[in-house]
């Protein structure tokens, strides 16, 4: 598949200043770091579990720039499904069985069905990548994965899984070979003995399909989010179900880390060498620069802005020192306006009821002007 787009005009219009670009030496144009620093980043990631099931959860990420929820959601979902590592049975030895195209006396299922059931065993190893599990059962009975004894370094996660049914008074002895991997590896891909990681492959060794992925389901949906009165932002809701070997939020974090590692290879510049880089306001101003912004810069509704103006609240630094009770005592200021202001402050990592020493500063006008120039 070929994805192509003529983006030369887009690069010029956006002021892109890549390494070696003719725009990078233009002093009056956009700083390189503005391309990522000036984008809206999520102010919260909320994990909502499905009842008491710790392996099922929705992760709500907002606000995101328009279009970013689809981009990030698709990338995270694909990486979670394909690239997270887990453990699986990749081969077995069944007593008196030389290949999978046979049946066992006294066992209801044939060997092919038994192998299919074994491939669905979910387990977790601790401190090792390989292990051989043994199971010895005497019929008649149902053989389930929970009959494999837990050890300090191995935990069976789905103990009710049916492996086979012994209809007669027969012995069923099996060894299961476990290792770590990613994705799905069918038995037909394990043609080479070296791929098994075994020094001496038994004559009755039978390869099985191995599903290593710890993710059972992963999906996402995109909704609208808002900052103040602007609603053209995205909310990403990721629904993840795991096999209990990891938690849903851990799965998303691992997928993000994999993407971070892959994307790092595309960055061909050193941020510390950026030309004409201005000093960050936070390094030279005695206050958080957001506190020095005037409230009329915020995208507030007319009612909320007029309430602040009538209460002589000029700077955000004045606003955050008010408590919610103080604000609700302001004439014409209600819960809707309070929620609006709380959302805007949260997007700047601020909140009502803050204590700011030595506020307001004597030179607040000059400091505010310095911030606006930055």
From Swiss-Prot:
Alpha N-terminal domain (alpha-NTD): region residues: 1-270
Region (Alpha C-terminal domain (alpha-CTD)): 282-374
Keyword Transmembrane helix appears in the UniProt entry: no
InterPro entries in alphabetical order: DNA-dir_RNA_pol_insert, DNA-dir_RNA_pol_RpoA/D/Rpb3, DNA-dir_RpoA, RBP11-like, RNAP_asu_C, RNApol_insert_sf
GO biological processes: DNA-templated transcription
Principal EC category: transferase
Main function: DNA-dependent RNA polymerase catalyzes the transcription of DNA into RNA using the four ribonucleoside triphosphates as substrates.
Family membership: Belongs to the RNA polymerase alpha chain family.
Subunit details: Homodimer. The RNAP catalytic core consists of 2 alpha, 1 beta, 1 beta' and 1 omega subunit. When a sigma factor is associated with the core the holoenzyme is formed, which can initiate transcription.
Protein name: DNA-directed RNA polymerase subunit alpha
Organism listed in the record: Ehrlichia ruminantium (strain Welgevonden)
Gene name of the record: rpoA
